[in-house]
From Swiss-Prot:
<feature type="modified residue" description="Phosphoserine">
    <location>
        <position position="395"/>
    </location>
</feature>
<feature type="compositionally biased region" description="Polar residues">
    <location>
        <begin position="269"/>
        <end position="281"/>
    </location>
</feature>
<feature type="region of interest" description="Disordered">
    <location>
        <begin position="262"/>
        <end position="311"/>
    </location>
</feature>
<feature type="compositionally biased region" description="Low complexity">
    <location>
        <begin position="378"/>
        <end position="395"/>
    </location>
</feature>
<dbReference type="GO" id="GO:0010570">
    <property type="term" value="P:regulation of filamentous growth"/>
</dbReference>
<feature type="modified residue" description="Phosphothreonine">
    <location>
        <position position="379"/>
    </location>
</feature>
<keyword id="KW-0539">Nucleus</keyword>
<dbReference type="GO" id="GO:2000218">
    <property type="term" value="P:negative regulation of invasive growth in response to glucose limitation"/>
</dbReference>
<feature type="compositionally biased region" description="Polar residues">
    <location>
        <begin position="12"/>
        <end position="22"/>
    </location>
</feature>
<feature type="compositionally biased region" description="Acidic residues">
    <location>
        <begin position="61"/>
        <end position="77"/>
    </location>
</feature>
<feature type="modified residue" description="Phosphoserine">
    <location>
        <position position="142"/>
    </location>
</feature>
<dbReference type="GO" id="GO:0045894">
    <property type="term" value="P:negative regulation of mating-type specific transcription, DNA-templated"/>
</dbReference>
<dbReference type="GO" id="GO:2000221">
    <property type="term" value="P:negative regulation of pseudohyphal growth"/>
</dbReference>
<feature type="modified residue" description="Phosphoserine">
    <location>
        <position position="272"/>
    </location>
</feature>
<feature type="region of interest" description="Interaction with FUS3 and KSS1">
    <location>
        <begin position="212"/>
        <end position="452"/>
    </location>
</feature>
<feature type="compositionally biased region" description="Low complexity">
    <location>
        <begin position="331"/>
        <end position="348"/>
    </location>
</feature>
<comment type="subunit">
    <text>Forms a complex with DIG2, STE12 and either FUS3 or KSS1. The interaction of FUS3 with STE12 depends on the presence of both DIG1 and DIG2. STE12 is lost from FUS3/DIG1/DIG2 complex after pheromone treatment. DIG1 and DIG2 have also been reported to interact with CLN1 and CLN2.</text>
</comment>
Length: 452
């Protein structure tokens, strides 16, 4: 304190002692006591020194107040810092933000057991475990949570067999031929009907009498319509009958129709040599025709010569024609197998009955079915792989197909999921088919070597 010794009193000494002990709370009290004592001393002092002493006492208390406040503030800060260090931190697990997050799900335990139980206690068994065993015992793993579509089909590759060299490259054409009549190839038709006329220039330059037609002619007729010899085929027109002129006649009333021609043959049969009313020229001509047919030279006769002999006035009688044709068939069937002769004779009988019924379309279908049933035409189309004409109804989630490699045919199917996965699955199937075909080729080659 900057107060002179002569101005100190007993009251000031007590206030200073208290301020040293409690500087925070007793600062104002000491200042007030000092002011009161100074005022009393000024009143008792002489008038000359009153002004200077008053000014000195007013300036000293302001400096003491600011210094004490700064010291008290520093002491309070140090005390609070010590209290914070001494106080322990709160547990972060009990914070409000973490309390809002739910506990993680135990998917591994819940997926391996189909029965409800208390997961916290660790007891996953239930009262139904005796009746329904858990899935974990059956070695079945459930799909992950992100998989929502489960397929019922599994990828499969099946070996169908080995295709012959004469089989068509288009193995399964059921989708292309659906709703269309079946048209056999040229070799099959010629084998079933050996005397059917055929235009040899219809498929030039792709014509091959013993092979398969080109791809653009598979579903098209490759031969002229079948005409029962010696019936001539009348011209057909696409103009409706109502728009034709007065001279035009419908095809049914034409002189080339089957009914009128059959009536002419019946009328001519009365002049046959069997009835005894035929002329000598007709008898000689019939004998020459039968002699030529027995040798087989009539089969090589040109179409112009045959048509010239079939004039309306010189028609061959029905009985004589049947006799000649039977002789021709018997001569030609000697060089054929037993099965082919049986099918040919049966088809001939059916053709003979169909002439009297005037149903050529039905006759052709019956003859074809008969040849297939008897096995007279052992072609690979009917014997090797029999394909159904009905289209296969595929599931929208299942892809099916066939792969032919080195005359080996493989069928495959796998479920559809996505474009990338489907492509990888197909490529893996192609790799498997490639490896299997190589193994089959090696086995077949080794088998041929051991057989030789």
């Amino acid at each position: 304190m900057a107060v002179s010794a002569r101005l100190r009193t007993t009251a000031e000494d007590t206030s200073i002692a208290k301020s040293t002990q409690d500087p925070i709370g007793d600062t104002e009290i000491s200042v007030a006591n000092a002011k009161g004592s100074s005022d009393s001393n000024i009143k008792n002092s002489p008038g000359g020194n009153s002004v200077g002493q008053e000014s000195e006492l007013e300036h000293v208390p302001e400096e003491d107040d600011s210094g004490d406040k700064e010291a008290d503030h520093e002491d309070s800060e140090t005390a609070t810092a010590k209290k914070r260090k001494a106080q322990p931190l709160k547990n972060p697990k009990k914070s409000l933000k973490r309390g809002r997050v739910p506990a993680p799900l135990n998917l591994s335990d819940s997926n391996t057991n189909t029965h409800g139980g208390n997961i916290k206690d660790g007891n996953l068994a239930s009262s139904n475990s005796a009746h329904f065993p858990p899935v974990a015992n059956q070695n079945v793993k459930s799909a992950p949570a992100q998989v929502t579509q489960h397929s019922k089909f599994q990828p499969r590759v099946q070996y169908l067999g080995k295709a012959s060299s004469r089989q068509s490259i288009q193995v399964n054409n059921s989708s292309n031929s659906y709703g269309k009549p079946h048209m056999p190839s040229a070799g099959i038709m010629s084998a079933m009907n050996p005397y059917m006329p055929m235009n040899r220039y219809i498929m030039s330059p792709y014509y091959n009498p013993y092979g398969i037609p080109p791809p653009h002619m598979l579903n098209k007729p490759i031969m002229t319509p079948y005409v029962s010899y010696p019936y001539p085929m009348g011209p057909r027109t696409s103009i409706p009958y109502a728009m034709q002129g007065g001279n035009a006649r419908p095809y049914e009333e034409n002189e080339y129709s089957a009914s009128n021609y059959r009536n002419k043959r019946v009328n001519d049969s009365y002049d046959s040599p069997l009835s005894g009313t035929a002329s000598t020229g007709k008898t000689r001509r019939s004998e020459e025709g039968s002699r030529n047919s027995s040798v087989g030279s009539s089969a090589n006769a040109g179409p112009t010569q045959q048509r010239a002999d079939l004039r309306p006035a010189d028609m061959i009688p029905a009985e004589e024609y049947h006799f000649e044709r039977d002789a021709l068939l018997s001569a030609n069937t000697k060089a054929r197998s037993a099965s082919t002769s049986t099918s040919t004779s049966t088809s001939t009988n059916r053709d003979r009955s169909s002439w009297h019924e005037a149903e050529p379309n039905k006759d052709e279908e019956e003859g074809t079915d008969l040849a297939i049933e008897d096995g007279a035409v052992p072609t690979p189309t009917f014997t090797t792989f029999q394909r159904t004409s009905q289209p296969q109804q595929q599931s929208p989630s299942l892809l099916q197909g066939e792969i032919r490699l080195s005359s080996h045919i493989f069928a495959f199917e796998f479920p559809l999921s996505s474009s990338n996965v489907d492509k990888k699955m197909f490529m893996s199937i192609c790799n498997k088919v490639w490896n299997e075909s190589k193994e089959l080729t090696k086995k077949s080659s080794s088998h041929h070597r051991t057989g030789k």
